[in-house]
């Protein structure tokens, strides 16, 4: 499953594991190109042409972009030749061609977290963070530039079938939709669109852990409604332990968290806290800062290193839980915002991290809303722990190794 207050200041910014943490559960006309020219201005596409599913007439062949080193001649020549020579005109869908061109532009950068999101994909990602969506219960991302399972969602189809974090997704098959494709070169949003579908229908995934043989898993799609936080109390002779199980940093996480904190502080027998962020792919950075702030007495929670400067993000609230000792549970499915919280508690509270080394997503995406309901996720920075360390691609090491049951 991070958006400028979008993930670090605005609420609608999030770190994409796309992890989703693209976390991403199977993810223009109006987009800015250059400094002051929109794609609509560049190609003169009309909404009526799209509505009629016809190839739009390009009226502005010469790019009005002011940069002298940008030449769109090859682009227009390709468009013209397809329009003129391609034998099956029914496949010349102007809208898809525009989306494909924009996707190619972002993919050319070579950063899997910088991506164009067509309206349907953008809508689905928003659903993911809201906690209600249809699918098989998998957060998608990348490992070694290959599509992979970041985290299976508890009590849903993938987890029940034994799917585990870190498995590569090699192939997707859906007989009903006539889908039978390898995932090499596939974007996270493409995989999301293929894996999601109508409730009760089947999709088969070919999965493999690194160095192991692939295996097929047949999953039945379902409607998924998942709270982001669960609280349970564990009794012990010396007092209760509050076990906070945090599955993502979504739209309702801070609200759910505040309710849990109230419960914990109301129970005078609570002596400690276990913050469980195993298989948490991330989400809104703002939520992560709020939660981490409850454990500390002010100070920096995370820093963001951009092109030209570094910005510090301090604690956003009074530390209501700072009197309790805390242990943090993580694993290889813990990514992005969950790594920020774990790292902040390690550096600021000397909290012990228990479990497995984390995923290692240390980049910041600005999740921008653009025309026609589409989205554009742009990597704008790396985030740094209070210690100044980056965990990009390396993850957080743990103090005590433990294997998930």
Please describe what each predicted stretch is:
Residues 131-181, 381-382:
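PDZ/PDZ-like domain segments forming the peptide/carboxylate-binding groove
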Residues 372-381:
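Short acidic, Pro/Gly- and aromatic-enriched capping/linker segments at domain boundaries
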Residues 2-113, 145, 267-268:
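Terminal targeting/pro-maturation regions of precursor/exported proteins
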Residues 108, 390-405:
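Conserved functional hotspot residues or short segments at active or partner-binding sites
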Residues 170-171, 377, 392:
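Hydrophobic beta-strand signal
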Residues 90, 159, 164-165, 173, ...:
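Cleft-lining beta-strand/loop regions that shape enzyme active-site pockets
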Residues 83-151, 200-204, 208-231:
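Extended, small/polar residue-biased N-terminal targeting/export presequences
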């Amino acid at each position: 499953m991070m958006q400028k207050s979008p993930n670090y200041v605005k609420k609608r910014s999030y770190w994409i594991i796309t992890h989703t943490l693209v976390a991403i559960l199977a993810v223009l006309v109006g987009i800015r190109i250059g400094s002051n020219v929109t794609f609509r201005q560049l190609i003169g596409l009309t909404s009526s042409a799209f509505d009629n599913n016809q190839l739009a007439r390009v009226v502005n062949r010469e790019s009005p972009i002011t940069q002298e080193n940008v030449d769109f001649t090859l682009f227009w020549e390709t468009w013209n030749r397809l329009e003129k020579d391609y034998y099956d005109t029914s496949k010349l869908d102007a809208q898809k061609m525009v989306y494909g061109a924009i996707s190619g532009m972002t993919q050319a950068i070579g950063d899997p977290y910088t991506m164009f999101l067509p309206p349907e994909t953008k809508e689905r990602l928003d659903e993911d963070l809201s906690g209600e969506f249809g699918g098989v219960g998998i957060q998608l991302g990348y490992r070694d530039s290959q599509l992979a399972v970041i985290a299976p969602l508890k009590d849903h189809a993938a987890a029940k079938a034994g799917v585990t974090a870190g498995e590569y997704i090699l192939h997707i098959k859906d007989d009903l939709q006539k889908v039978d494709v390898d995932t090499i070169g596939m974007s996270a949003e493409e995989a999301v669109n293929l894996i999601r579908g109508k409730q009760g229908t089947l999709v088969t995934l070919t999965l493999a852990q690194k160095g192991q043989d692939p295996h097929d898993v047949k999953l039945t799609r379902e409607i998924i409604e998942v709270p982001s936080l669960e609280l349970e109390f564990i009794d012990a002779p010396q007092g209760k332990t509050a076990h906070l199980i945090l599955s993502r940093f979504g739209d309702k996480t801070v609200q759910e968290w505040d309710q849990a904190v109230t419960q914990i502080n109301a129970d005078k027998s609570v002596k400690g806290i276990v913050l469980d962020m195993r298989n948490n792919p991330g989400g809104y950075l703002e939520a992560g800062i709020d939660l981490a702030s409850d454990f500390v007495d002010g100070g920096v929670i995370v820093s963001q290193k951009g092109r030209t400067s570094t910005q510090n993000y301090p604690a956003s609230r009074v530390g209501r839980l700072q009197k309790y000792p805390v242990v943090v549970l993580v694993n290889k499915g813990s990514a992005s915002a969950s790594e920020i919280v774990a790292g902040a508690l390690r550096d600021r509270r000397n909290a012990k991290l228990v479990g497995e080394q984390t995923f290692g997503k240390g980049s910041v995406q600005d999740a921008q809303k653009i025309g026609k309901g589409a989205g554009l996720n742009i990597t704008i920075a790396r985030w740094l722990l209070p210690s100044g360390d980056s965990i990009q691609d390396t993850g957080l090491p743990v103090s005590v190794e433990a294997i998930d049951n």
